[in-house]
Amino acid sequence: MMGFVKKIRDFFDLDEEKWEEDEYEQEEVAQQPKVEQKQNVVSLQSVQKSSKLVLFEPRAYAEVQEIADHLKNRRAVVVNVHRVDRDQARRIVDFLSGTVYAIGGDIQQVGSTIFLCTPDNVDVSGSISIVSDDEPTIKRW
């Protein structure tokens, strides 16, 4: 029987003396620096502090550029044009309409002579009825 086992060992090359154990060296793995990811968390207080609403009562068309500059700087503006004549008021509203269009904002009439101009970072919800039963009807813009 030993002959049979020896033949199998020789066939499969299972001779105990031929086996050498390989020596394994442990490789040092280079530590890669951790990539710090910036978190996409913004404090609500910082967002609220940076938002501003500016009120204007222009007395001349020349003031409209200052109003537009506030819109370009992403500030909402409420404009009351009651201090200028109707033609000047129309020019002011036309200029501001072009400005809010260019910056992707919005303009809404919230009173007979009051307009709310908002840049694209300000959302306005709700609506205000301009004409009520108590007020006399005024021609719309």
Swiss-Prot record:
Coiled-coil stretches = none
* Keyword check for Endoplasmic reticulum: no
Principal localisation: cytoplasm
Q: Where in the cell is it found?
A: Cytoplasm
Which keywords has UniProt assigned to this entry? Cell cycle, Cell division, Cytoplasm, Septation
Quote the Pfam families the UniProt record gives: SepF
GO CC terms on record? cytoplasm
Tell me, which GO biological process terms does this entry list?
division septum assembly; FtsZ-dependent cytokinesis
By its UniProt entry, which InterPro entries does this protein fall under?
Cell_div_SepF, Cell_div_SepF/SepF-rel, SepF-like_sf
- Describe the task this protein carries out: Cell division protein that is part of the divisome complex and is recruited early to the Z-ring. Probably stimulates Z-ring formation, perhaps through the cross-linking of FtsZ protofilaments. Its function overlaps with FtsA.
Q: What is the annotated quaternary arrangement, including any partners? A: Homodimer. Interacts with FtsZ.
Sequence similarity? Belongs to the SepF family.
Q: Report the protein name in the record.
A: Cell division protein SepF
Which gene does this sequence derive from? sepF
